[in-house]
Swiss-Prot record:
Belongs to the cytidylate kinase family. Type 2 subfamily. It comes from Methanococcus maripaludis (strain C5 / ATCC BAA-1333). Keywords: ATP-binding, Cytoplasm, Kinase, Nucleotide-binding, Transferase. It catalyses: CMP + ATP = CDP + ADP; dCMP + ATP = dCDP + ADP. This is Cytidylate kinase. One of its GO terms (molecular function) is dCMP kinase activity. The lineage of its organism: Archaea, Methanobacteriati, Methanobacteriota, Methanomada group, Methanococci.
């Protein structure tokens, strides 16, 4: 089984992916972790690396390559803002493609708690990062990140806690047609 989970920062994609991975015994591959690791390898902050990635397409190409390679082996949760799009462009059909969304201020508070920084700083970084990514996705892939038409399930994650979101997805998985 291949499941993609996408969403903007602070929507709960990592938490949800981990819960699903544990429940279904699927490997968890996260594009964000790959991106963060690459930023650390280059001694850059996420903001600096996002700016760097805008003009260096090899960053996205490497992340994509690793995601497609993982998906080809099957049985995984592929987490990333473009996970669903990358598989679509590679002619790999996931069993379920999910997008999590949440109110920007809810996301900002979640990010500030996760990163242990004040909300104003988290908001500034979030806006900058999302603008950078949106630009990059359009230029490199001709993808509008706001186009949710490829997803089987779109969940407003600010309405439920992590277990509530997990329960919705669990029901969807358990009711997939064979």
């Amino acid at each position: 089984m291949i499941i993609t989970i996408g969403g903007l920062p602070g929507t709960g994609t990592t938490t949800t992916s981990k819960l699903l991975s544990e429940k279904y015994g699927l490997k968890h591959v996260c594009a964000g972790f790959i991106f963060r690791d690459m930023a650390k390898e280059m001694n850059m902050t996420l903001q600096e690396f996002s700016s760097y990635a805008e003009t260096n397409t090899e960053v996205d190409n490497e992340i994509d390559r690793r995601q497609v390679e993982a998906a080809q082996s099957g049985d995984l949760i592929l987490e990333g803002r473009l996970a669903g799009w990358i598989l679509k462009k590679s002619d790999i059909k996931p069993d379920l493609s999910i997008w999590l969304k949440a109110d920007p201020m809810v996301r900002c508070v979640r990010i500030s708690e996760r990163e242990n920084e004040n909300v104003d700083l988290a908001l500034e970084k979030m806006i900058s990062r999302e603008a950078s990514e949106k630009k990059r996705y359009k230029e490199i892939y001709n993808i509008e990140i706001d186009d949710l038409s490829i997803y089987d399930l779109v969940i407003e994650s600010s309405k439920w806690d992590a277990n509530g979101v997990f329960n919705i997805i669990e029901k969807a998985i358990d009711n997939l047609k064979a």
